[in-house]
């Protein structure tokens, strides 16, 4: 796990430093050495909670998926809700025999979890992150080729743990598309546009993951302060976009010298937050930051950032994505699911994964719960002004505070979209 090095500039003002002399004796409560004399790091208590451990696993899958998608889209925005894709894969693993199941489980990092009831814990995770106050809508579905006979022993646990039933295609492309669109509309409460892409004839197994989120800040922005301002696409090009501003924003902040970026965290209602990664220089190459993203690293950030007051500007954002993540998953050691998997717990007929579709919508504007910061946020007193302007390419992570789950991730090179 990458160590988080936060050169906060305010550390000295806070009267302490997190750096320690390597020659100093270990403090009380520090890890004990093993038989070789090496320090053995104890697992963070946060990750000892089964649902948090599972959330970390599927989130690490999500960061992997994001990295693959971003590497194939170096000059365009990337928007993903990896949880919905992970949920579809996890649900599909219920119908896999051991060889195929282990392939899916390794991709989802389940091989690092000792929980005997992963699917039961997944239900707890879904119930937590899709609670009404979270403002997150997320759903997944498994669609099978026409006339396939599905075993009831697969359907029952699928419905119990994942709250969904499989769909068998009729063979009529127009009716199948209409039915899937109707399902998406029902799950997303009409927040996502209907797809016009026909279902391919050669479908054997289609996985569908959909999600929508409209954030509500704990402290709303004053819409009267929103104005058109420059957003730097790169060192030479700018565009004018609506920018929200708060001259006295209370946020959590840190400067990571290893990643050459400024990190800020803004709280949302429903026990959620958005973490922003803003490079020190204008660039569309965010690879250094992207390679560092793991559940453990984000958890460390959440613990280490300091509450400050800053001049903040954030672009209004409304993005959507509709497309396949099939090729991305094939690059993530899941190719065998598309070749010769064993899904004999689903049906007696040989079937394989042929397509994975993802639809997502994400939005934030000035809306918030109140006009003053949370009473629990006491900013450090700074002797210099601190600015945090999201007026150049950046990465954001939408994280559930209760479980640590990655819910959305985006690379914003141009706030205008798509």
Swiss-Prot record:
- In-chain residues carrying the UniProt-annotated modification Pyrrolidone carboxylic acid: 20
| Main localization (coarse) | secreted
The residues the entry assigns to the signal sequence are 1-19
Looking up CDD domains in the UniProt record yields:
serpinF1_PEDF
* Modification Phosphoserine occurs at: 24, 114, 227
- Cellular compartments annotated: Secreted; Melanosome
Q: A single GO molecular function, which one?
A: serine-type endopeptidase inhibitor activity
Gene3D superfamilies, from UniProt?
Answer: Alpha-1-antitrypsin, domain 1, Antithrombin, subunit I, domain 2
- This chain belongs to the protein called Pigment epithelium-derived factor
Where does this protein come from, organism-wise? Homo sapiens
